[in-house]
Structures are given as structure tokens and as C-alpha cells.
């Protein structure tokens, strides 16, 4: 499915660039065309996967030359904000669904993929409807194609939990009790790095979903209607504050990937992480600590106006430039 995803996206970018007369350039007498592809996966194992799919596409389409550029997560975000509106915009690039990409849409910088999906029923049918919702606007415009689903879970060190006599928590009160026991046993309860600021938003955003109703959040998360006056947001911050004493020291000065390393090396009994981070932990060839004995559990329940059983998750995907 992913091989087809890349192939069809590349073909879509090719057709779109020829239609607009932009980005697609002649580089030889044989009119070899260039597609610029920008992604945020310079590390293994993802980089090799992308390189393999691109090599396959170029072999099957000798008239196409794909120029690839990649960058780590946070530098990627900053560069993308600069290049998307410029003359050197990549034809295909990774982008997060929601407001991160929708601001580009409001500036007419993202191609509407709806007609391309309608013209290729096999491609359309291969995509999960539940994931496509996140890359579809209210008016029906499909602006991106997901290639994997991400979710947030607490990763925990099984050995440290057992040594401290801690059970997997299912409620927030149980989570705080677990943190106290781990701390008393000499362990850092939660490995945390908030240097880039987004890790805090993942905690608070998850808690918001439990303390604020879906209807209110939908209104507030829309730029034109957001007010953020619901008391549930204050409650969420208060819950988050209860966790702060159990984070490692200097958490705002530590990068998120360093927090992951700390967890992998035993310097943190828990780590609120994305499931896509698993290969960085236990991949036999590239993982930080392939022998780490760890498990996972969802963010413990909080009774509030929202959904106590919520699991924070979102698909990740690619979009095509309209330039």
C-alpha cells in the first residue's frame, strides 16, 4: 500500500506540475523532468524505505528525476514554513494534518487531491476512511494522503515498575500514586524533554480531551471561533501541574529525543511517547536499547466533561504543492 502511495503521489505531482507549468523542469535533451520531494525522515529505518520506493519509481519512469531533501523534525518545520510559499517549494512534502497544513491551504499553496482520487478508484479504495477524515476539509477537499497512523502512549520500564511494586495505572490518581512510589524507590518517574515546547502540548492536549467536551474543543480549535473560556482548560493545566514534580530536572532544557534516550537507558520509568518512536528504541540494528524491557499503556482516565477513554492519535502524511 505504501509503495502505491508514493507512486501515485509522485505521478500526481508530475501531472499537476505539467498542468501549471511550474516546478517541473527540463534537464536534458530527452526532457527529463524533476520532482522535488521534502520529508522529515533522515534517520533509519524510514530513510531507507523512502529511498527504496523512490529508486523503484525512477527505474519504472526513466524520464523522472526525483530530488530528495530531508531534515529532522523541528528544523524541518522551520524550513517548510519558509519554502512552501517561495519559488523553491518542493512538489511533494510531508505535512501534519490540521492547522499546520490548513494555513497553507488558505493561501492556495496546497493542491486539491480530490479529482485525482476520484480518477483512481483503486487508489481511493486503498485508503482508510477514518484516516482520510483528518486530511479532508469540511467542504470535501482532500488535501493530503496519510501513510501511517500515530498515537500517544505511556511507555514504561517493566523492571523498574516491578522493583517499585507499581501496577499499571488506569486513572490519573493511580498515575500520581505510581509516580510517588517510583520516586520513593529511587527512580525518576517520567523522562521528559520540553525544549521544543510541543511535548507539553501533547500532555495538555490529551488532558483537554478529557476535561473539555468535543463540541467546545471543536469550536475553540477553529481559528475563527476559538475563545478558550471553558473552565475545563484550566482543569487540564492543573492536572498537568500535578505531574511536574515527577519529571526529570531541567525538563524545559532537554530535547525530546534526549528524553527518549534517557528512558531507554533507564533514566526514567515512564515516557509519554508516540508509537512511531518504537523503532528508535528496540530496532535490532538502529534502536537505542533493543534489550529494554518495556510496555505501554494509554494515558490514564480523568473524569470530566470530555471523553475519559480518549486515545490521542493522528495520521501523518504527504501533500502536493499547488505551485
Task: Go through the PLM ranges and name each one.
Residues 31-42, 64-69, 91-92, 143, ...:
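Short, well-ordered beta-strand elements
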Residues 114-127, 211-235, 284-289, 301-309:
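Short, solvent-exposed loop/beta-turn-alpha elements that line the ligand-binding surface or hinge
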Residues 179-182, 222-252:
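Glycine-centered hinge/linker elements that transmit conformational signals in sensory
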Residues 138-147, 152, 176-225, 268:
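Extracytoplasmic/periplasmic solute-binding protein
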Residues 1-36, 59, 117:
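Short, low-complexity disordered leader/linker segments with a strong preference
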Residues 97-153, 176, 202-205, 232, ...:
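Hinge/lid segment of periplasmic solute-binding proteins
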Residues 33, 55-60, 65, 86, ...:
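Extracytoplasmic/periplasmic substrate-recognition and gating elements
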Residues 56-127, 134, 159, 163-170, ...:
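Extracytoplasmic "Venus flytrap"/periplasmic binding protein-like
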Amino acid at each position: 500500500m505504501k509503495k502505491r502511495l508514493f507512486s501515485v503521489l509522485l505521478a500526481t505531482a508530475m501531472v499537476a506540475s505539467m498542468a501549471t507549468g511550474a516546478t517541473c523542469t527540463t534537464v536534458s535533451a530527452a526532457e527529463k523532468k524533476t520532482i522535488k520531494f521534502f520529508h522529515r525522515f533522515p534517520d533509519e529505518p524510514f530513510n531507507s524505505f523512502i529511498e527504496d520506493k523512490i529508486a523503484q519509481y525512477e527505474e519504472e519512469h526513466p524520464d523522472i528525476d526525483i530530488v530528495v531533501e530531508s531534515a529532522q523534525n523541528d528544523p524541518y518545520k522551520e524550513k517548510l514554513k519558509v519554502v512552501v510559499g517561495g519559488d523553491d517549494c518542493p512538489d511533494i512534502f510531508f505535512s501534519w494534518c490540521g492547522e499546520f497544513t490548513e494555513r497553507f491551504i488558505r493561501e492556495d499553496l496546497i493542491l486539491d487531491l480530490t479529482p485525482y482520487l476520484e480518477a483512481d478508484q483503486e487508489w481511493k479504495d486503498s485508503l482508510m476512511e477514518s484516516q482520510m477524515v483528518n486530511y479532508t476539509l469540511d467542504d470535501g477537499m482532500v488535501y493530503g494522503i496519510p501513510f501511517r497512523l500515530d498515537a500517544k502512549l505511556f511507555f514504561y520500564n517493566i523492571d523498574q515498575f516491578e522493583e517499585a511494586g507499581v501496577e499499571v495505572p488506569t486513572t490519573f490518581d493511580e498515575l500520581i500514586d505510581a509516580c510517588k512510589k517510583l520516586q520513593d524507590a529511587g527512580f525518576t518517574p517520567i523522562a521528559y524533554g520540553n525544549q521544543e515546547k510541543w511535548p507539553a502540548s501533547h500532555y495538555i492536549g490529551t488532558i483537554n480531551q478529557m476535561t473539555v467536551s468535543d463540541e467546545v474543543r471543536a469550536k475553540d480549535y477553529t481559528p475563527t471561533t476559538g475563545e478558550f473560556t471553558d473552565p475545563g482548560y484550566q482543569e487540564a493545566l492543573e492536572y498537568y501541574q500535578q505531574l511536574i514534580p515527577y519529571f526529570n530536572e531541567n525538563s524545559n532544557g532537554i530535547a525530546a529525543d534526549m528524553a527518549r534516550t534517557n528512558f531507554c537507558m533507564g533514566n526514567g520509568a515512564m515516557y509519554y511517547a508516540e508509537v512511531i518512536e518504537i523503532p528508535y528504541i528496540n530496532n535490532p540494528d538502529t534502536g537505542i536499547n533493543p534489550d529494554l524491557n518495556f510496555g505501554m499503556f494509554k494515558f490514564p482516565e480523568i473524569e470530566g466533561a470530555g471523553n475519559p477513554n480518549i486515545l490521542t492519535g493522528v495520521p501523518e502524511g504527504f501533500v502536493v504543492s499547488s505551485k
